[in-house]
Amino acid sequence: MGARASILSGGKLDDWEKIRLRPGGKKKYRIKHLVWASRELDRFALNPGLLESAKGCQQILVQLQPALQTGTQEIKSLYNTVATLYCVHQRIEIKDTMEALEKIEEIQNKNKQQAQKAETDKKDNSQVSQNYPIVQNLQGQPVHQALSPRTLNAWVKVIEEKAFSPEVIPMFSALSEGATPQDLNTMLNTIGGHQAAMQMLKDTINEEAAEWDRVHPVHAGPIAPGQVREPRGSDIAGTTSTLQEQIGWMTGNPPIPVGEIYKRWIILGLNKIVRMYSPVSILDIRQGPKEPFRDYVDRFFKALRAEQATQDVKNWMTDTLLVQNANPDCKTILKALGSGATLEEMMTACQGVGGPGHKARVLAEAMSQVTNTNIMMQRGNFRDHKRIVKCFNCGKQGHIAKNCRAPRKKGCWKCGKEGHQMKDCTERQANFLGKIWPSSKGRPGNFLQSRPEPTAPPAESLGLGEEIPSPKQEPKDKELYPLTSLKSLFGSDPLSQ
């Protein structure tokens, strides 16, 4: 404990023990607080020996300050103790821990202002920008460094592989950083094919150059000695200006960024070319029934990059069309998320939609709903449907004959005759010809009602015995079919007479 307590001695220790832990409190700092701080530093893998000097305390404060917002109470207490100890080392008069924290904050703000001022002075004293490809030689003069073959090869490879896809524009912007108009023309001249696109690009550059000449007219009078002439539209395009003039405009005071201006014109023309090479409109991007939502979002934003619209319009397209053109499964999920959902939430919610697992789950839910609906409908039908019964005794509805209170009817309930019951009633309903349907106990109506007569000659013709009189068929037929004569329906037949 003696080694840990030897951090302060003499007058500094007396000053330490006069400082209160809290404003207006009775408790004051003691040697045990130094011992505790030393152990905590050891626990946090920090050197406890840093507490012996003001510089060491400052280093500890720098290490602990980022953890104050998310740290535990022990870290905050350790920071307060080290801040108070720093004030004791610096002989700063304080009464409590709160004053020590305020002093530390003042010192940190002062150091930050000094650092910002030094950085500002450094920028003011700095030389002209040395961005590639304009660099300074040993004499401090700006000179041009040509584009490397590797850069040109990368640009040509992008055009060959991607043609004029939307990603060509950011690639061109990255490869042409700080380039002069001459460098930009070199990049455009390396494109062998796509001459129709190159002609469209030239037309756009000529239009922008004419607009530049209209907005920036030439001043009358001679040019003052030591001054550089103002660039025209053709100068910016690199057709009527030399490389030295371009460097002079870009490094002058004030500088005229002819390279950046020409670069904007080229990007404007590339946007038109990309729009031509991407004939698919953003309105035609729709999600397929089995297409994953992630692939649909990729196609959507690729087409959105090719759209020539402001950022506000593109934001509206993203908020509206992305949900509107999704398939029904994803659209149901996206509408449930609401209009304030982020793209990350949309992709997380629609993850797996369209796959076999999702299809099986949706089908199971649909079948469950249909089954429940049918069960409810069946229950409802059985509940609401009431069978209407009719009494055979009195003929009224609502009860059966067994429970009928009316006097019991004698005889058959169907024909009214006595001597038999309704189940044994032989009354049958006649058909449209007036024929009574045969009984169900007999032969069906489509069967012959009598046996057919044999066509063999009588026995007497064969000399086998006495003549057997054949039964008379006509009276029997009349008995079976008494009302089947056509005369009763259509009158006498003149042909039969």
Curated annotation (Swiss-Prot):
Keywords: AIDS, Capsid protein, Host cell membrane, Host cytoplasm, Host endosome, Host membrane, Host nucleus, Host-virus interaction, Lipoprotein, Membrane, Metal-binding, Methylation, Myristate, Phosphoprotein, Repeat, RNA-binding, Viral budding, Viral budding via the host ESCRT complexes, Viral nucleoprotein, Viral release from host cell, Virion, Zinc, Zinc-finger
Region named Interaction with host CALM1: 8-43
PTAP/PSAP motif, short sequence motif: residues: 454-457
Chain residue ranges for the region called Dimerization/Multimerization of capsid protein p24: 277-363
UniProt region (Interaction with Gp41), positions on chain: 7-31
GO CC annotation, single: viral nucleocapsid
Region (Interaction with membrane phosphatidylinositol 4,5-bisphosphate and RNA) location: 14-33
Motif (Nuclear localization signal): 26-32
Residue numbers of Phosphoserine PTMs: S148
Region (Interaction with host AP3D1): 12-19
Chain positions of motif Nuclear export signal: 16-22
Lipidation (N-myristoyl glycine): G2
Residues covered by region (Disordered): 436-497
InterPro entries assigned to the protein according to its UniProt record, in alphabetical order: Gag_p24_C, Gag_p6, Lentvrl_matrix_N, Matrix_HIV/RSV_N, Primate_lentivir_Gag_pol-like, Retrov_capsid_C, Retrov_capsid_N, Retrovr_matrix
Region of interest (Interaction with membrane phosphatidylinositol 4,5-bisphosphate), ranges: 73-77
Residue numbers of Asymmetric dimethylarginine PTMs: R408
Annotated stretches, region: PPIA/CYPA-binding loop: 217-225
Remarks, miscellaneous: HIV-1 lineages are divided in three main groups, M (for Major), O (for Outlier), and N (for New, or Non-M, Non-O). The vast majority of strains found worldwide belong to the group M. Group O seems to be endemic to and largely confined to Cameroon and neighboring countries in West Central Africa, where these viruses represent a small minority of HIV-1 strains. The group N is represented by a limited number of isolates from Cameroonian persons. The group M is further subdivided in 9 clades or subtypes (A to D, F to H, J and K).
Name of the protein in question: Gag polyprotein
Species whose genome carries this gene: Human immunodeficiency virus type 1 group M subtype J (isolate SE9280) (HIV-1)
